Each structure stands twice: as structure tokens, then as C-alpha cells.
């Protein structure tokens, strides 16, 4: 079973941070940046979305937390008059948006988003919508296994710089340098 979780990247589901902290106290909770950006852009007019999104990118592409925070303040100041509420959640949630800055650039690129697991969840939801009743638990497990197996056939692109990512994560896991338990989860 899982012995430790280095990073949990999730959307803003209430209670997830506290639940994970209770079971795995050393886990870094990271709010999904892609979800944060999407939620922010809901407050922005269509004509300004591209420019606003580029400004947001400057925050999460910053080299360190201090620079990211300064860029967040700069983006807030720039757009405050036109979109006074757009950046409010960034400021309120900075503590769960900034943990990524503790990791290397390679690791950050992996943890920005939960899209990979969301894609798998989509496959599993489709299975559920096609067939809402299963004759037994075993039938359900077999269907889930086959759907997952089929989904993995599409996973042809390796993660960029995966060697460096695992190396960085191993260095973060001080108590067990020989095995890595790196989970990026969405709930």
C-alpha cells in the first residue's frame, strides 16, 4: 500500500487538505493551477482572456515563491480596476497555490495540473454512464480494469524530463531515498 505521498494536486474540494494531512502529515497539498486559472478567467471578458491568462502564467512560471507572489500582486494591480474580484482567490489561496515553488521546474510542470487523472476519470465516468447496473462486484471490477487498460494504450507520450522529476522527488523524500511514492491525485 501507499506509505507516503509527496504531493497531492487537487482542485478546491473542501476538506481534502485536512483529510490528507490526517492520514499523511508530510504531504504537500497543491491546488491545481489549471483549475485556478479557469476559475479566474470566469470573471474576465472574452476580449481580455488571452492577455489575462498570459499574465497569470507569469505567476506560476516564476522562478521562486517570492517572485511568484510579487507577480501575483502586479497582475492584481494591473487588472484591479477592470476586474476587481478576479484575483481575490489567488490572494486567499496563496498558501495552497505556492507549494509548487519548493520543487524544481521539471516537477512543477508535472504538478501544475490534474489533467492526466481527469482524463482517466472521464473514461471511468463514461463506463458508468453506459452501464449503471453491474451484476456483481467482480463484474464492476473487471469493467473498470478493462476500461483502464484501454485508456493506457493511448498513453504514448512519456513525461518530459521524467528522470529529473523522479530524481528531484527522491531528494525530497528524506526518509526513503530508494523508493519513490509520487502521486498526483484528484478527488
Predicted regions and their residues:
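Glycine-centered flexibility sites
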Residues: 1, 12-15, 118
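Short, basic/hydrophobic alpha-helical segments
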Residues: 1-7
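Hydrophobic aliphatic residue packing
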Residues: 2, 20-23, 33-34, 117, ...
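A generic hydrophobic-helix recognition signal that picks specific residues
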Residues: 4, 28, 108-111
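Conserved beta-strand -> loop -> alpha-helix junction used to position metal-binding or nucleic-acid-contacting
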Residues: 7-13, 19-55
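Acidic/histidine-rich catalytic cores and adjacent linkers
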Residues: 58-187
Amino acid at each position: 500500500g501507499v506509505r507516503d505521498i509527496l504531493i497531492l494536486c487537487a482542485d478546491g474540494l473542501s476538506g481534502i487538505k485536512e483529510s490528507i494531512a490526517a492520514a499523511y502529515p508530510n504531504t504537500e497539498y497543491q491546488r491545481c493551477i489549471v483549475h485556478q486559472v479557469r476559475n479566474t478567467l470566469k470573471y474576465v471578458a472574452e476580449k481580455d482572456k488571452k492577455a489575462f491568462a498570459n499574465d497569470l502564467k507569469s505567476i506560476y512560471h516564476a522562478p521562486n515563491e517570492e517572485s511568484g507572489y510579487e507577480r501575483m500582486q502586479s497582475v492584481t494591480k494591473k487588472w484591479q480596476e477592470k476586474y476587481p474580484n478576479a484575483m481575490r482567490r489567488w490572494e486567499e489561496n496563496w498558501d495552497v497555490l505556492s507549494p509548487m515553488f519548493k520543487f524544481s521546474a521539471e516537477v512543477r510542470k508535472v504538478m501544475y495540473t490534474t489533467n492526466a487523472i481527469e482524463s482517466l476519470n472521464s473514461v471511468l465516468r463514461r463506463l458508468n454512464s453506459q452501464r449503471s447496473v453491474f451484476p456483481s462486484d467482480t463484474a464492476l471490477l473487471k469493467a473498470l480494469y478493462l476500461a483502464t487498460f484501454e485508456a493506457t494504450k493511448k498513453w504514448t507520450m512519456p513525461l518530459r524530463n521524467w528522470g529529473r522529476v523522479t530524481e528531484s522527488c527522491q531528494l525530497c523524500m528524506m526518509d526513503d531515498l530508494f523508493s519513490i511514492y509520487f502521486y498526483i491525485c484528484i478527488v
